[in-house]
Amino acid sequence: MSTLQTLWRSDPAVARIIDGEMRRQRDGLELIASENYASRAVMEAQGSALTNKYAEGYPGARYYGGCEWVDQVEDLARERVKELFGAAYANVQPHSGSQANMAVYFTFLRPGDKVLGMNLAHGGHLTHGSPVNFSGQLYTFVAYGIDPKTERIDYEQVAEIAHRERPKMITVGASAYSRAIDYAVFRQIADDVGAFLFADIAHPAGLIAKGLLPSPIKYAHVVTSTTHKTLRGPRGGIILMGEDFENPFGLKAAKSGRTLMMSELLDKMVIPGVQGGPLMHVIAAKAVGFGENLQPEFETYARQVIRNAQTLANALIARGYHVLSGGTDNHLMLIDLRNKAVSGKAAQEALDRAAITTNKNAVPNDDKSPLITSGIRLGTPALTTRGMKEPEMEQIAALIDDVITHINDDHVINRVREEVMALCARFPVPGLEPST
């Protein structure tokens, strides 16, 4: 009983569930693009005594006493992430990427303001204007998408829509787009129409941080990210700015009358605007994760993530799969399964039975519901954390093809599952041992 020892004694029901999830992660291939394996150090920080501490406010300006240690860890997290991205400002308190985005929208916009964001069906995100999300309910979103031929962002269309609609903000970022984004072009479009540029880099953040993809830091007025995914830290959010600037809304400090900086408005919007007490144990884990990201070996990891994704995409293309845009520049790919006559839901469920975890995903012009979809999204961050490289990607492509080609054949799926478990045994998850 190497882990969860106290939990097995005090609450075996919960211990059993956690142990089952640990075994699932250990014994299966994780290809969900937004998932990764946090280090043991990150998890130790997140499970520390900082869980017990309330710390509303910011370092040096808390509403509670006894914050001398949590002040230090929040300062450390902020300094590390600023160094990582070359940012002048960082807020590490958002509980999630969605709450970071909410704080940005609430700071820069008013209800009903017009925003230009990427179509969810073309690779965008719920918080970029989906009508079922607060963003689409509070603001007037118009969508840009990908070119139907190249399956890449159509920058001419973006400019055309922006000039026609005159949005107050342009949101750039995606959850299922496999190509590098030209933030300089987006900034030029934003400047041409007098819009703020907001970049959500939740998915490629780790690759951007190591200079392997273009960075929006010097182009966007504000940037958000999650801290897991390609950053491989705890689940959480951050807000960044490449440079601070005076707010353009005429807001003044109550006593001095000076113009408030945007950093001050963002800080006030995070707390008390959209959150209360920060999760100090998670902020400590963020600090640990950022420290790991700053090490030279993380660049080696990030480069391998991209090489693995490109190898996997090419191997699937060679087997007749429609990978959108014909490949990938980052950690993920979107597979349109319509030429295989298989739905995303059916593929996901069959792959689950083979211990290959993916997620169904809508594709452009999808005629199926979001609960069914015509595609799946694949990513390589977690596989790369296990130490897998190009040869394993070739093998995994063959296993995926076996399952989808024989989607109703339990014999094939069981054989693939055995191969998956053997492969996983060769590449254990760092720091994740079974508890019994």
Swiss-Prot record:
SUPFAM superfamilies: PLP-dependent transferases. Keywords: Amino-acid biosynthesis, Cytoplasm, One-carbon metabolism, Pyridoxal phosphate, Transferase. The record marks 228 as: Plays an important role in substrate specificity. Coiled coil: none annotated. InterPro entries: PyrdxlP-dep_Trfase, PyrdxlP-dep_Trfase_major, PyrdxlP-dep_Trfase_small, Ser_HO-MeTrfase, Ser_HO-MeTrfase-like, Ser_HO-MeTrfase_PLP_BS, SHMT-like_dom. (6S)-5,6,7,8-tetrahydrofolate binds at residues 120, 124-126. It is found in: Cytoplasm. It catalyses: (6R)-5,10-methylene-5,6,7,8-tetrahydrofolate + glycine + H2O = (6S)-5,6,7,8-tetrahydrofolate + L-serine. The modification N6-(pyridoxal phosphate)lysine is found at residue 229. GO terms for molecular function: glycine hydroxymethyltransferase activity; pyridoxal phosphate binding. Its cofactor is pyridoxal 5'-phosphate. PROSITE patterns: SHMT. One of its GO terms (cellular component) is cytosol. GO terms for biological process: glycine biosynthetic process from serine; tetrahydrofolate interconversion. It holds the Pfam family SHMT. Pathway: One-carbon metabolism; tetrahydrofolate interconversion; Amino-acid biosynthesis; glycine biosynthesis; glycine from L-serine: step 1/1. Its EC number is 2.1.2.1. Catalyzes the reversible interconversion of serine and glycine with tetrahydrofolate (THF) serving as the one-carbon carrier. This reaction serves as the major source of one-carbon groups required for the biosynthesis of purines, thymidylate, methionine, and other important biomolecules. Also exhibits THF-independent aldolase activity toward beta-hydroxyamino acids, producing glycine and aldehydes, via a retro-aldol mechanism. PANTHER family: SERINE HYDROXYMETHYLTRANSFERASE, SERINE HYDROXYMETHYLTRANSFERASE 1. Homodimer. Belongs to the SHMT family. NCBIfam families: PRK00011.1. This is Serine hydroxymethyltransferase. It comes from Roseiflexus sp. (strain RS-1).
